[in-house]
Amino acid sequence: MAAPSEVAAAVLGEGDGGAFGSWLDGRLEALGVDRAVYAAYILGVLQEEEEEEKLDALQGILSAFLEEESLLDICKEIVERWSETRDVTTKVKKEDEVQAIATLIEKQAQIVVKPRVVSEEEKQRKAALLAQYADVTDEEDEADKKDDAGASTANVSSDRTLFRNTNVEDVLNARKLERDSLRDESQRKKEQDKLQREKDKLAKQERKEKEKKRTQKGERKR
């Protein structure tokens, strides 16, 4: 499984998401938070959590670094910035997908089936066969030619339609598999995020306990 930082880099590097990634890195650095580690965890929360749960999850991540008075406002700022970026990115991706399918259909419609080239030897063989069956009337021969032409046209049209529909279906299936893979990867990363948040909370609690002991020790000396 890819490391969280690699997953974050892959997602934040796409389209307008890159702008959000740059903004988030700068914001975390200004707050004194390790952006190389926590940008990935924050991204996982923004992608996977429900809207009403995003703020709580972000507060759980950043509470080890921020004062309680400013924690909520900063988390709201991150969520709002993410929502604005995702609205733009989603619109662009949908337009790109529609354009890709339209282009594929257009290309398939332009495919021209080359007519079969009949060699001189085949022509001679056909002429010999016709000579053996001289009782075949001109009317029957003309009717057969018309039937053959109609059947060929129908077959070519059917083949084109089938080829075009198959390719469009392949494109849609490939995109679905890609989305499923990203969703599974995000779910695994989300579980890692929760473990990391628990570690951060314990570390914060330990720091508070140590600070409390130092304060009490100083008071006893006085």
Swiss-Prot record:
Keywords per UniProt: Coiled coil, Isopeptide bond, Phosphoprotein, Ubl conjugation
Cross-link (Glycyl lysine isopeptide (Lys-Gly) (interchain with G-Cter in SUMO1)): K93
InterPro entries: CCDC43 (IPR037666)
Segments of this protein annotated with the region Disordered: 136-222
Modified residues (Phosphothreonine): T137
Ranges of biased composition (kind: Basic and acidic residues): 172-209
Protein name as annotated: Coiled-coil domain-containing protein 43
Native organism: Mus musculus
Gene name, Swiss-Prot/TrEMBL: Ccdc43
